[in-house]
Design a protein with these regions (language model features):
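Loop/helix patches that line or flank the sugar-binding groove of alpha-linked glycan CAZymes
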Residues: 3-9, 23-45, 240, 257, ...
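Aromatic- and acidic-residue-enriched segments that line the glycan-binding/catalytic groove
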Residues: 4, 8, 28-32, 78-90, ...
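Hydrophobic faces of well-ordered beta-strands that scaffold small-molecule active sites
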Residues: 11-14, 67-69, 113-115, 199, ...
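Active-site-proximal helices and loops of the catalytic beta/alpha 8
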Residues: 103-109, 121, 126, 130-137, ...
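Active-site-adjacent "subsite" loops/lids of carbohydrate-active enzymes
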Residues: 123, 127-194, 202-204
Length: 419
């Protein structure tokens, strides 16, 4: 299968917009909690697109060359996975002009930017769903959702319509409806034409229809053949990687193996880890995964059970050594703490930046981005894993060039070297 050429050279940085940076250049109407407050599922910090633009030089300075933005469309939630309007930037974040300026500056700095597409479900505030609540079965949008009874029970008791994981705030689209499909495809086309470099697709497996994603791919690639389409798939991804749907997946299979080997009290063996590592990067598949150790859905590295500096150091080094595009979750380079959602979505303490840049992980991330950017073998080379008891090697080979990560467990702490 073909993946966009630029992705093999990409190092992604994931941003949760509400918590990244709040610039005073943009004044949103509304009341926000003080920056640095404890995150909850409901509170809003007021991070904005201008704040992201203000920090692009910082991001570029890490050695990163691609940004993955969590949802930015109009929504009534801090994470914005409850979409109200797919064609409008959330006014808390900024304006369409702010978005265009951000994309332009990202590209001027030689970086790429992909957006989060939430196409399985929307918000109760979505216009067409509101029409059903007002007009019932007489709504012209009655076929847009999976309704089981009238009137809609959207705010009390058990919902009588299909919704994501039975959350009434997230009504599920009926993607068998031609009008729904066309609407969602037009969303993808609109933002692709505005200059983004691809899509991260939220829970795409919930749209259990290959033809939907095949058409999605065709529409996006017709506008930008080099757009990167990456799906949030937590388990075996082969179905989605036949060359006609996604270019890659978020490599949660890799992440799970690393967590169970390094950060679990009941750790798997080195032999089992090597098997799982190989399974996460099968030879000959040809896709371009997004490799990650943390995201807005997971506990941060520094807050994991059994965490230690040596384990974090090895985990990050391994991620940058593997095929695919590594992705750093915002603040991971600063050693930010964070347990389960919503604690893993804390605001970046920019006022403490000089102090936090002294964290060894900050230096490590810059060293790893430099290593990957400076060695084509880590971006294009074939991979081989060899296991011997409690030791193993990962070797990348490109022509006559070879790099090897040699690892052993000494007193349960990973010891490794690159040669």
């Amino acid at each position: 299968m073909y993946s966009p050429a630029w992705v093999k050279d990409a190092i992604f940085y994931q941003i949760f917009p509400d918590r990244f940076c709040r610039s005073e250049r943009y004044k949103a109407v509304g009341k926000f909690v003080p920056w640095g407050s404890k995150p909850t599922r409901e509170n809003m910090f007021g991070g904005n697109l201008a704040g992201i633009e203000d920090k692009l030089e910082y991001i570029k300075g890490l050695g990163v060359n691609a940004i993955y933005l969590c949802p930015i469309f109009k929504s009534n939630s801090n994470h914005r996975y409850h979409t109200v309007d797919y064609f409008e930037i959330d006014p808390v974040l900024g304006t369409l002009e702010d978005f265009d300026r951000l994309v332009k500056k990202v590209h001027k700095l030689g970086m790429r930017i992909i957006l989060d597409g939430v196409f399985n479900h929307c918000s109760r505030g979505f216009f067409q769903f509101n029409s059903l609540m007002e007009l019932g079965p007489n709504s012209p949008y009655v076929d847009w959702f999976h309704v089981k009874g009238w009137p809609l029970n959207a705010y009390s008791g058990k919902p009588n319509y299909e919704c994501w994981w039975n959350f009434p705030a997230l009504p599920k689209f009926n993607t068998n409806c031609a009008d729904v499909r066309e609407y969602l495809f037009s969303v993808a086309e609109y933002w692709t034409r505005r200059g983004i470099d691809g899509w991260r697709l939220d829970v795409p497996n919930e749209i259990d229809d290959d033809s939907f994603w095949q058409e999605f791919r065709r529409r996006v690639k017709e506008i930008n053949p080099e757009a990167y389409i990456v799906g949030e798939i937590w388990d075996a991804p082969e179905r989605w990687l036949q060359g006609d749907q996604f270019d890659g997946v978020m490599n949660y299979v890799f992440r799970k193996a690393v967590m169970q080997y390094l950060f679990d009290e009941n750790a798997i063996s080195t032999e089992e880890f090597c098997k799982r590592l190989q399974a996460a990067f099968p030879e000959g598949r040809g896709d371009m995964p997004m490799n990650l150790l943390g995201s807005h859905d997971t506990t941060r590295l520094k807050s994991q059970p059994c965490t230690s500096w040596e384990r974090i150091k090895f985990a990050l080094t391994l991620m940058f050594f593997m095929p695919g595009a590594p992705c750093v979750y915002y603040g991971e380079e600063l050693g930010m703490l964070g347990g389960k959602d919503p604690d893993n979505r804390r605001s970046v303490p920019w006022e403490k930046l000089p102090e936090m840049q002294k964290e060894p992980v900050y230096t490590l991330v810059k060293e790893l981005t430099a290593m990957r950017n400076g060695n084509p073998v880590l971006r294009d080379g074939k991979m081989e894993i060899a296991c011997d008891g409690e030791s193993f090697t990962v070797t990348r080979t490109l022509g006559k060039k070879k790099m090897t990560l040699a690892v052993s467990l000494a007193e349960n702490e990973p010891q490794f070297e690159i040669r």
